Amino acid sequence: MSKPPSDPPRRPPAAFAYEDEASEPRNSGRQQQGRRKPESFSENIVVTPDEDDPFINPDSDLIAPPVATPRKRRTSFGKIAAGAFGILLSLGLGLWTDRLIRDLFTRADWLGYAALGVLAIGILAVLALVIRETAGMMRLAAVQTIKAEAEAAILETRPAKARAVLARLTTLLAANPETSKGRATLKATEGEVIDPPHLMALAERELLAPLDRKARALIVNASKRVSIVTAVSPRAVVDLLYVLYEAVRLIRAMAELYGGRPGTLGMFRLLRDVLAHLAVTGSIAVGDSLVQQVLGHGLASKLSARLGEGVINGLMTARIGIAAMDLCRPLAFRTLKRPGIGDFIADLTPSMSPRGNNP
């Protein structure tokens, strides 16, 4: 009778040391020997937050210009003095006209009647001019009123006030054919229940999006013209005069685009508001951020100094256009993105931008 096969002898359990575990004490000993001694630091050290660190957030240097707002109208002693002397000069002009007409009547009746006819035509022309300027000022005031009422209507819970603001906005932009599609879309939503914030966002997308695209094209074209003229003009006076001409032309085109259509006095007031905003924010001078934007695209090494001046003047013209856009736009930027200076660098320097280098 054969015996069953016996199991092979089992190896007793043993512990093994891995290479990492074996080297750990040695490495820890080296680390302990290589540690530096604690030191004290000065209390004047300021830690820069991550959101302000230009190496972590390189786009933080491209600071968007602040939103332009119209200046508050205040009564000053200069305005009172100008009004008083204006009334005095008007009385003197009236007395001179009366004496002139009397003298003409003493010479011949037909001369007196002719002078009266000329005076009547002049008075009618002045009245028409006053009416036109007053209408232009009222249109500019209506734009700011709609903007303020829209901001207040967003905070309401009922859409009645937002609907009223939307009706005024539609009336303001009714003469612009580019808003016809948006007006039809908004008219189709009259029977629907929409919250005021969503209603104003819909109005901004449907009515102002095509106008914003055209406004951006106006700013780009004006900036390009200023850049070219600055690069080829022989005198700095020519640069200054042309920049002023393009600024006035751009501000007027921006006001007419958004339904303002200012007159002569309204244009002066709008120009004063834009220049006051640029002077307060320091946008007239070439600041560090603007220089960084230009030099960051390699213009210092790839362009001549004259062409670099043209690009800087073009960027300043773009800032004027952005400020005019803020003042003339009947709704504040909420749903749509507000343009910044960085959006126009690629248009002024296409060969230096990644978009221009792509085939």
Curated annotation (Swiss-Prot):
It is found in: Cell inner membrane. Its main location: membrane. Signal peptide: none annotated. Pfam families: DUF697. It comes from the Bacteria. GO terms for cellular component: plasma membrane. The keyword Translocase does not apply. Residues 1-50 are annotated as: Disordered. The chain crosses the membrane at residues 77-97, 111-131. It is a multi-pass membrane protein. The keyword Cell inner membrane applies. Keywords: Cell inner membrane, Cell membrane, Membrane, Transmembrane, Transmembrane helix. NCBIfam families: hyp_HI0043. HAMAP family: UPF0283. Belongs to the UPF0283 family. This is UPF0283 membrane protein RHECIAT_CH0002430. The lineage of its organism: Bacteria, Pseudomonadati, Pseudomonadota, Alphaproteobacteria, Hyphomicrobiales.
